């Protein structure tokens, strides 16, 4: 089944060219199907890139998905055109009286800030509070996962000695849980972050379950036991060249940056990256949509 997005959204033609089933709203409305309503709070600077990455994964399931893109009202993006934001994005004020099957809160390159110092922190708190009653299941990604753990459970983030940067191996702790159904015993995830959360802080919260961890990158996948909240410290949605772009961007700016680990062939930046995480990315999003959202949400959203 398709993902339902506006035909003029840049991701529409990109995904259609990849043979991902996309459908415009006029065609979707002619079908007698209740689509899953998913809202994406996009906090990343380049919103078009991020929305395309996420829609690619959401569009590869048997379920019809209707997407709402959300931006912050209290902070204006400097890397995405105002025309794009006006055409395709809503604010929390527009949706606060609605209910959704799923919510995705993306990462944001603001790890150096305390949560309370983030320009849109109060607005983000409103969205996370809204998710308790108006969303069936929420997926938090990278900084979004740290923000969610902090807001809901008071779990702080800590700076790392060096940037966690590259593709890292993770071990599954519970092969029977549905969110990782079909996963291999070990799987690879891209990471790009300067902060982390501590295992002990998560273990002190009975509602939380650690599902996957890396010896080198730390905790990767955490969920509430009712799967209402999923927290992912990495970026399974990343494309082949995303870390490459970050690496050369930082080099061009004269920043001290290590070569991303386990990413370029032979660890040589002159070689192409090797994609080793794509299958598990699709599987995680498919499992989330099926087991945490579709199987749990009411047919009629109130």
From Swiss-Prot:
<feature type="binding site">
    <location>
        <position position="249"/>
    </location>
    <ligand>
        <name>substrate</name>
    </ligand>
</feature>
<protein>
    <recommendedName>
        <fullName>Homoserine O-acetyltransferase 1</fullName>
        <ecNumber>2.3.1.31</ecNumber>
    </recommendedName>
</protein>
<feature type="binding site">
    <location>
        <position position="163"/>
    </location>
    <ligand>
        <name>substrate</name>
    </ligand>
</feature>
<comment type="function">
    <text>Transfers an acetyl group from acetyl-CoA to L-homoserine, forming acetyl-L-homoserine.</text>
</comment>
<dbReference type="InterPro" id="IPR005697">
    <property type="entry name" value="HST_MetA"/>
</dbReference>
<feature type="active site">
    <location>
        <position position="237"/>
    </location>
</feature>
<keyword id="KW-0808">Transferase</keyword>
<dbReference type="Pfam" id="PF04204">
    <property type="entry name" value="HTS"/>
</dbReference>
<dbReference type="GO" id="GO:0008899">
    <property type="term" value="F:homoserine O-succinyltransferase activity"/>
</dbReference>
<feature type="site" description="Important for acyl-CoA specificity">
    <location>
        <position position="111"/>
    </location>
</feature>
<keyword id="KW-0012">Acyltransferase</keyword>
<dbReference type="InterPro" id="IPR033752">
    <property type="entry name" value="MetA_family"/>
</dbReference>
<dbReference type="GO" id="GO:0005737">
    <property type="term" value="C:cytoplasm"/>
</dbReference>
<keyword id="KW-0486">Methionine biosynthesis</keyword>
<dbReference type="GO" id="GO:0019281">
    <property type="term" value="P:L-methionine biosynthetic process from homoserine via O-succinyl-L-homoserine and cystathionine"/>
</dbReference>
<dbReference type="GO" id="GO:0004414">
    <property type="term" value="F:homoserine O-acetyltransferase activity"/>
</dbReference>
<feature type="binding site">
    <location>
        <position position="192"/>
    </location>
    <ligand>
        <name>substrate</name>
    </ligand>
</feature>
<feature type="active site" description="Proton acceptor">
    <location>
        <position position="235"/>
    </location>
</feature>
<keyword id="KW-0028">Amino-acid biosynthesis</keyword>
<feature type="active site" description="Acyl-thioester intermediate">
    <location>
        <position position="142"/>
    </location>
</feature>
<dbReference type="InterPro" id="IPR029062">
    <property type="entry name" value="Class_I_gatase-like"/>
</dbReference>
<comment type="pathway">
    <text>Amino-acid biosynthesis; L-methionine biosynthesis via de novo pathway; O-acetyl-L-homoserine from L-homoserine: step 1/1.</text>
</comment>
<comment type="similarity">
    <text>Belongs to the MetA family.</text>
</comment>
<feature type="site" description="Important for substrate specificity">
    <location>
        <position position="192"/>
    </location>
</feature>
<keyword id="KW-0963">Cytoplasm</keyword>
């Amino acid at each position: 089944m398709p993902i339902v997005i506006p035909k003029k959204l840049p991701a529409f033609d990109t995904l259609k060219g990849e043979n991902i089933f996309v459908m415009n709203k006029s065609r979707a409305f002619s079908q007698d199907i209740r689509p899953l309503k998913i809202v994406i709070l996009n906090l990343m600077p380049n919103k078009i890139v991020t929305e395309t990455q996420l829609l690619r994964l959401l569009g590869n399931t048997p379920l019809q998905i209707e997407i709402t893109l959300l931006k912050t009202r209290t902070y204006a993006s400097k890397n995405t055109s105002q025309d794009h934001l006006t055409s395709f994005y809503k604010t929390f004020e527009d949706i606060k009286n609605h209910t959704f099957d799923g919510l995705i809160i993306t990462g944001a390159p603001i790890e150096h800030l305390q949560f309370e110092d983030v320009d849109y922190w109060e607005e983000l708190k409103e969205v996370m509070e809204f998710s308790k009653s108006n969303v069936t299941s929420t997926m938090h990604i990278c900084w979004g996962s740290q923000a969610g753990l902090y807001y809901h459970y008071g779990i702080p983030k800590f700076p790392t000695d060096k940037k966690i940067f590259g593709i890292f191996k993770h071990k599954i702790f519970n092969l029977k849980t549905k969110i990782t159904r079909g996963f291999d015993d070990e799987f690879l995830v891209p990471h790009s972050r300067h902060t982390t959360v501590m295992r002990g802080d998560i273990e002190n919260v009975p509602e939380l379950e650690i599902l996957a961890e890396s010896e080198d990158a730390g905790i990767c996948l955490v969920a509430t036991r009712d799967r209402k909240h999923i927290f992912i410290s990495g970026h399974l949605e990343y494309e082949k060249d995303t870390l490459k772009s970050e690496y050369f961007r930082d080099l061009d700016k004269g920043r001290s940056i290590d070569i991303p680990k386990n990413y370029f062939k032979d660890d040589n930046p002159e070689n192409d990256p090797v994609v080793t995480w794509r299958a598990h990315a699709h599987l995680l999003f498919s499992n989330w949509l099926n087991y945490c959202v579709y199987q749990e949400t009411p047919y009629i959203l109130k």
